[in-house]
Amino acid sequence: MELILSLLCVLVHIPTLMLRYVPFKERVSSKNKKRLIFWYTAGLIPDFFLCLWIIKTGRMTVTFYKFNMLFYCVIMGIVNILIIKGYTKEHLFSFGLTALIVWLTFAIGVYITEQIGYGMLNEGLILETIIGFTLYIIFYHWYRNLMRKTVTPFLDIDSEDYWNNIWFIPIAMFLSGLLSHGLEEYTATVHQLISRILLGMATIVLCHRIAQDYRKMLEKIQLNQRLKCKKNTTLP
């Protein structure tokens, strides 16, 4: 059980790594892909042994489990900023949105785990992680499309206003949800689950709608520019 939980504590980082990489996939050179893989792995290996030591010494707690997820997420977010350069606000937005998605997904996993029941804390963490991973796999296509639609279209154009308006929204929502429930909490009541789902869905819908509106505005501007150019070319 110790090895299984240690492995799951490491694998739980994979969803955020994948989702934050998706929007920038076409803009990462083969050299930088290798650098990302190196640093991701360099972070996962010591984390595995740290988790194994924590579990073997009987120090595994809900606080450590959650803090470990968050700390690795922050460190690898910094790695992304340093390697995939020129997209700082885009990375911060991706960090917040993916953290919110994973937090929401695993909150559902926690609630289901509570309903199933478990003996020791380690058993509950294993079950929660497995359920969370299963939900992530089920919804991965939708999560991926969300990241592609809210980030990717605005990387190659002058979208400074867009990122100035949106980059902090998912981070603020994620932190407000995290701090309101606390790192030490494991038990999830139905009311807590509903509040997390509503907070997460509201943030996702808001970011998606802002992206849609901004995309439409850019299309109108481009159309007006083409019409203006066409009009100028037809003048005697």
Say what each PLM segment does.
Residues 1, 122-127, 190-195:
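Interfacial loop-to-helix junctions that mark the boundaries of transmembrane helices
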Residues 1-14:
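Hydrophobic transmembrane alpha-helical segments in integral membrane proteins
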Residues 15-37, 50-166, 171, 177-185:
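Juxtamembrane segments at transmembrane-helix boundaries
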Residues 40-44, 48-50:
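N-terminal, Lys/Arg-enriched amphipathic/low-complexity engagement segments
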Residues 130-134, 193-203:
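Small-residue-rich transmembrane alpha-helices that serve as helix-helix interface/gating elements
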Residues 141-154, 177-190, 200-232:
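Juxtamembrane or sensor-core-proximal signal-transducing alpha helices
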